[in-house]
Amino acid sequence: MSLEIVLITGMSGSGKSVALHALEDAGYYCVDNLPPELLSAFVELEHGRHSNKVAIAMDARSAGGLPHLPGQLERLQRQGVVPHLVFLDATTGTLVRRFSETRRRHPLSQGPVAEGRRALVQDIETERELLGDLREKSHVIDTSHLRSSQLQSYIKELIAAPVGQMTLVFQSFGFKHGLPSDSDYVFDVRMLPNPHYEPQLRPLTGMDAPVAEFLRQQPGVDQMRRDIQQFLESWLDMMASNHRSYVTVAIGCTGGQHRSVFLVEELARHFAPRWPTLCRHRSLDSRPTLKPADLLAHDV
């Protein structure tokens, strides 16, 4: 029986505990804070004992063992085990707010629990530097504006994607909510006609037929779709040959409700027959974002 491994890493306070809970609900045997140097030995030991699906969380608490991780991953690949690598991130400002609101100590902190902002920012930036190489090898999810249910949904979508084949992730967003840091390519479509100014279309989204019909009739919309499509078609094969597991393409309009959503749906529909494809609409759900206490419960 083949073994499925999901390796969750990322910044402290970014939501690794939420991700592990989602994987546990999906039937994974979960282990938090495994020393990186024990990864291949642990996988070999656990093979067939608990489950054929294992999720492991690693972060800066195991900073001393991180240099061993590339070798451990290569050893797993030689054994025919290719893990999903997922890196959870958030902006420094978001992480500072989460730690400050919960009054928890950052794992790299040498000071008191309620350390000053300057010291906390320094700890976060040190952690970001420590994990930089690992981030480059992983699929990145920016949790800065996500609710816990959104993050859980993203994780479950990722584990359903085939390992060893590049997956395209198309995501819409609104520039007024900030630029998503987990994107490989970002396209700005704010110059296109905006359905927001049509009263009957304002409450709808780019997934609704009246909005789609409106946009298909507007000058420049189809040209934008074809330009993005042509760019990706020109380079996707080369990206895949470079052993990329995921490519995240973000399309942004002002609010992330109409134009970007429509184009994401159109592009995903076009590429889905050839590539595993995921869709995300970051700005559509305006409900509260992840609570700091939920995010930090097991991250520090």
Curated annotation (Swiss-Prot):
GO terms for molecular function: ATP binding; GTP binding. Belongs to the RapZ-like family. GTP binds at residues 59-62. Pfam families: PapZ_C (PF22740), RapZ-like_N (PF03668). This is Nucleotide-binding protein Daci_5422. ATP binds at residues 10-17. Keywords: ATP-binding, GTP-binding, Nucleotide-binding. Displays ATPase and GTPase activities.
